[in-house]
């Protein structure tokens, strides 16, 4: 994969833009305090994003970046590219707007729109994005040779980066700003506006690896900060309709449903007596505040009557089912990428000092674009209130995924989650095989205490198995952090293809 941004400026006489092969970095993302003009019409003057904490002094036109379907009667539905007039932005992350074409008014999520003709409104602008994430986006099957995006530079605060797909690799170029205004990739070819620069390289490569083609596809709409503008955690269960059962587990059933008639949701229906409603509501309030692209969004609960209902966003299927049904269609880099996404979500929980306690493929959800989200984080602590004997015998306890200090002494920490993550990695590379095949829970406890670890699965790269072994160190303090696991797996995503080809023979 192409790119190493941050090299020296091209010399004044350079005849082509400078790009290099990729060295994936993990630098922190800098702020981008100003937006360049993209054409004859000036972009937003307030910075990279509109200040949502102030009134927009005059009504302003914004363009929809994604489709949004109203979730309540007070919301406003719109489609991508619709023009919306913002009337009031004092409601935090939900703004009151008028649809220019229909005249209808209602609340909209502010992160679904951008000021008309600003850089953020352009389909090729992706804002703050790491190089490795740009590469993953561009190499997605939705994109073809020549697909491109513009993002904020990781290493230079006021610069931008152009990322371009060339066949099955990605090249990166720095877009620099001139002191007197204007932009360039090669000094010999400056442009008055960013729009002019993009248009030029769409017409001809002129030193780039390829002519710019279609903007990179944005496959997912962003999460809204809350489910609705007037966010209610406890909702009337009459507003939740169950359509069909899509799963079941030790604590209850999972249903596809609708909230407020037309909003698709998943509904976890807990078995009666599973949890005390007061305790559950207190814990669920904490869980609801956890927001990350790789965590399943919790929308609402119904706790006033049995059974307790948990309303969440709807995903297509759980990872275990996906692996068993379609996992063999994936190449090793895709399996590693799935693992890295889980590590990213767990790194956020780690940062928030929140323990999952039941990390396994059955509790990871996935869609057709191979984007995953972690589910059921924290539920185990609320729901697993069994006696000590029942827990240790594994009646309602996932022994094969549980770290020895947690299974034996009930010591659950982020490091016990790391152990479980190592077990999850075996599920991923074996397409959903049960861990410790042929062994009972009691045998697993005994053998793991004696130092036994699962051998390297067939077809698994040695470097990936080494990560598993690090997760299974007896001393919890010597296990890696999820932040470390994330970048290790992201580096594996860029592993020499020869190892993947060799590993793929067993598929």
Swiss-Prot record:
<protein>
    <recommendedName>
        <fullName>Tyrosine protein-kinase src-2</fullName>
        <ecNumber>2.7.10.2</ecNumber>
    </recommendedName>
</protein>
<keyword id="KW-0728">SH3 domain</keyword>
<keyword id="KW-0547">Nucleotide-binding</keyword>
<feature type="active site" description="Proton acceptor">
    <location>
        <position position="358"/>
    </location>
</feature>
<comment type="function">
    <text>Non-receptor tyrosine-protein kinase which may play a role in larval and pharynx development. Unlike src-1, does not play a role in embryonic development.</text>
</comment>
<keyword id="KW-0479">Metal-binding</keyword>
<dbReference type="InterPro" id="IPR001452">
    <property type="entry name" value="SH3_domain"/>
</dbReference>
<dbReference type="InterPro" id="IPR008266">
    <property type="entry name" value="Tyr_kinase_AS"/>
</dbReference>
<dbReference type="InterPro" id="IPR000980">
    <property type="entry name" value="SH2"/>
</dbReference>
<keyword id="KW-0727">SH2 domain</keyword>
<keyword id="KW-0597">Phosphoprotein</keyword>
<dbReference type="InterPro" id="IPR017441">
    <property type="entry name" value="Protein_kinase_ATP_BS"/>
</dbReference>
<dbReference type="Pfam" id="PF00017">
    <property type="entry name" value="SH2"/>
</dbReference>
<dbReference type="GO" id="GO:0007169">
    <property type="term" value="P:cell surface receptor protein tyrosine kinase signaling pathway"/>
</dbReference>
<dbReference type="InterPro" id="IPR036860">
    <property type="entry name" value="SH2_dom_sf"/>
</dbReference>
<dbReference type="InterPro" id="IPR011009">
    <property type="entry name" value="Kinase-like_dom_sf"/>
</dbReference>
<keyword id="KW-0418">Kinase</keyword>
<comment type="similarity">
    <text>Belongs to the protein kinase superfamily. Tyr protein kinase family. SRC subfamily.</text>
</comment>
<dbReference type="GO" id="GO:0030154">
    <property type="term" value="P:cell differentiation"/>
</dbReference>
<keyword id="KW-0067">ATP-binding</keyword>
<dbReference type="InterPro" id="IPR050198">
    <property type="entry name" value="Non-receptor_tyrosine_kinases"/>
</dbReference>
<feature type="binding site">
    <location>
        <position position="268"/>
    </location>
    <ligand>
        <name>ATP</name>
    </ligand>
</feature>
<feature type="binding site">
    <location>
        <begin position="246"/>
        <end position="254"/>
    </location>
    <ligand>
        <name>ATP</name>
    </ligand>
</feature>
<feature type="domain" description="SH3">
    <location>
        <begin position="57"/>
        <end position="118"/>
    </location>
</feature>
<dbReference type="InterPro" id="IPR020635">
    <property type="entry name" value="Tyr_kinase_cat_dom"/>
</dbReference>
<dbReference type="GO" id="GO:0160094">
    <property type="term" value="P:nematode pharynx development"/>
</dbReference>
<dbReference type="GO" id="GO:0005886">
    <property type="term" value="C:plasma membrane"/>
</dbReference>
<dbReference type="GO" id="GO:0004715">
    <property type="term" value="F:non-membrane spanning protein tyrosine kinase activity"/>
</dbReference>
<dbReference type="InterPro" id="IPR001245">
    <property type="entry name" value="Ser-Thr/Tyr_kinase_cat_dom"/>
</dbReference>
<keyword id="KW-0464">Manganese</keyword>
<keyword id="KW-0449">Lipoprotein</keyword>
<keyword id="KW-0808">Transferase</keyword>
<feature type="lipid moiety-binding region" description="N-myristoyl glycine">
    <location>
        <position position="2"/>
    </location>
</feature>
<feature type="region of interest" description="Disordered">
    <location>
        <begin position="1"/>
        <end position="52"/>
    </location>
</feature>
<dbReference type="Pfam" id="PF00018">
    <property type="entry name" value="SH3_1"/>
</dbReference>
<feature type="modified residue" description="Phosphotyrosine">
    <location>
        <position position="500"/>
    </location>
</feature>
<keyword id="KW-0829">Tyrosine-protein kinase</keyword>
<dbReference type="InterPro" id="IPR036028">
    <property type="entry name" value="SH3-like_dom_sf"/>
</dbReference>
<keyword id="KW-0519">Myristate</keyword>
<feature type="compositionally biased region" description="Basic and acidic residues">
    <location>
        <begin position="1"/>
        <end position="10"/>
    </location>
</feature>
<feature type="compositionally biased region" description="Low complexity">
    <location>
        <begin position="35"/>
        <end position="47"/>
    </location>
</feature>
<feature type="domain" description="SH2">
    <location>
        <begin position="124"/>
        <end position="216"/>
    </location>
</feature>
């Amino acid at each position: 994969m192409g790119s190493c941004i941050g090299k020296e400026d091209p010399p004044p006489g350079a005849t082509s833009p400078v790009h290099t092969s990729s060295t994936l970095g993990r630098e922190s993302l800098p702020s981008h305090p100003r937006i360049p003009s993209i054409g004859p019409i000036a972009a937003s003057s307030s910075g990279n994003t509109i200040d949502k904490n102030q009134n927009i002094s005059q009504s302003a036109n914004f363009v929809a970046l994604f489709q949004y379907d109203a979730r309540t009667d007070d919301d406003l539905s719109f489609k991508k590219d619709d023009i919306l007039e913002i009337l009031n932005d004092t409601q935090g992350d939900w703004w009151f707007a008028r649809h220019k074409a229909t005249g209808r008014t209602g609340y909209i999520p502010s992160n679904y729109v951008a000021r008309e003709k600003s850089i953020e409104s352009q389909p090729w602008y992706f804002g703050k994005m790491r190089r490795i994430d740009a590469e993953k986006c561009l190499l997605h099957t939705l994109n073809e040779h020549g697909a491109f995006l513009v993002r904020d530079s990781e290493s230079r605060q006021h610069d931008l980066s152009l990322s371009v797909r060339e066949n099955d690799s990605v090249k990166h170029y720095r877009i620099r700003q001139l002191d007197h205004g204007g932009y360039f990739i090669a000094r010999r070819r400056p442009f008055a506006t960013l729009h002019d620069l993009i248009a030029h390289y769409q017409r001809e490569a002129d030193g780039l690896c390829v002519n710019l083609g279609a903007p990179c596809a944005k496959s997912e709409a962003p999460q809204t900060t809350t489910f609705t503008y007037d966010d209610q955690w406890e909702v009337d269960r009459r507003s939740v309709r169950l359509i069909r059962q899509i799963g079941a587990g030790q604590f209850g059933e999972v249903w596809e449903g609708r909230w407020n008639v037309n909003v698709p949701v998943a509904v976890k229906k807990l078995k009666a007596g599973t949890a005390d409603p007061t305790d559950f509501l207190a814990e669920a309030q904490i869980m609801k505040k956890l927001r990350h692209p790789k965590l399943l969004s919790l929308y609402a609960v119904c706790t006033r009557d049995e059974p307790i209902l948990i309303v969440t966003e709807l995903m297509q299927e759980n990872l275990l089912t996906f692996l068993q049904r379609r996992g063999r269609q994936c190449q090793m880099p895709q399996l590693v990428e799935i693992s890295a996404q889980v590590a990213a979500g767990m790194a956020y929980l780690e940062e928030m000092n929140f323990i999952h306690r039941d990390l396994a493929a059955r509790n990871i959800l996935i869609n057709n674009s191979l984007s995953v989200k972690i589910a059921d984080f924290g539920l185990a602590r609320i729901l697993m209130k069994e006696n000590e004997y029942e827990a240790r015998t594994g009646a309602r306890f996932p022994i094969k995924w549980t770290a020895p200090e947690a299974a034996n002494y009930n010591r659950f920490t982020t490091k016990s989650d790391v152990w479980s993550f190592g077990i999850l990695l075996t599920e991923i590379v074996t397409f959903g095989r049960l861990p410790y095949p042929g062994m009972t829970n009691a045998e697993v406890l005994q053998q793991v205490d004696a130092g036994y670890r699962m051998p390297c699965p067939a077809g698994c790269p040695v470097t990936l198995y080494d990560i598993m072994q690090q997760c299974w160190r007896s001393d919890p303090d010597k296990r890696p952090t999820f932040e470390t696991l994330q970048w290790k797996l992201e580096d594996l995503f860029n592993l020499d293809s020869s190892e993947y080809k060799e590993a793929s023979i067993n598929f």
